[in-house]
Amino acid sequence: MYQDLIRNELNEAAETLANFLQDEANIHAIQRAAVLLADSFKAGGKVLSCGNGGSHCDAMHFAEELTGRYRENRPGYPAIAISDVSHLSCVSNDFGYEYVFSRYVESVGRAGDVLLGISTSGNSGNVIKAIEAARAQGMKVITLTGKDGGKMAGSADVEIRVPHFGYADRIQEIHIKVIHILIMLIEKEMVKG
């Protein structure tokens, strides 16, 4: 009944991943991002992560597997997804939704910390404002974007971009794989000392 549709969806996902893998720069960017994050943790820093919708869920997933557990038992790493409902609703009401992430970064971000900003379009205004706030705090910035990188293109120390111009879910599928690889590499870097 739906077998062809299912095959088409899985083939498109595989094709998107294959296209991402063809660009060796993506592999190097993932490695640079993981080392940057581990270096921050080793120096006493933390990572703040943010995004909207599915990207917000990815930001939470990233922080959860750093503070909790990925594949192996190990000490937790300092990671915070900007997802506190009282903060988000307060700032949205009092300042506007475009400031929900930047106000948090201004409040708890410090030099030596890292911001992970996630946006499939690269055009999320509140993530862009968070990047600006992170820069003002002396933080490093990593972005996970899609398509042509949007307005976020060129704004990060490390940008990991999925150059897919179809539906956003294909970009998100690569983002979550990248997030898992980042965590795996961070764990390896942290063991190195």
Swiss-Prot record:
Subcellular location: Cytoplasm
Superkingdom: Bacteria
List of residues binding Zn(2+): H61, E65, Q172, H180
SUPFAM superfamilies linked: SIS domain
Annotated metabolic or biological route of this protein: Carbohydrate biosynthesis; D-glycero-D-manno-heptose 7-phosphate biosynthesis; D-glycero-alpha-D-manno-heptose 7-phosphate and D-glycero-beta-D-manno-heptose 7-phosphate from sedoheptulose 7-phosphate: step 1/1
Pfam families found in the cross-reference section: SIS_2
Manner of cofactor binding, per the entry note: Binds 1 zinc ion per subunit.
Stated family: Belongs to the SIS family. GmhA subfamily.
Note: The reaction produces a racemic mixture of D-glycero-alpha-D-manno-heptose 7-phosphate and D-glycero-beta-D-manno-heptose 7-phosphate.
Function per UniProt: Catalyzes the isomerization of sedoheptulose 7-phosphate in D-glycero-D-manno-heptose 7-phosphate.
Official protein name in the record: Phosphoheptose isomerase
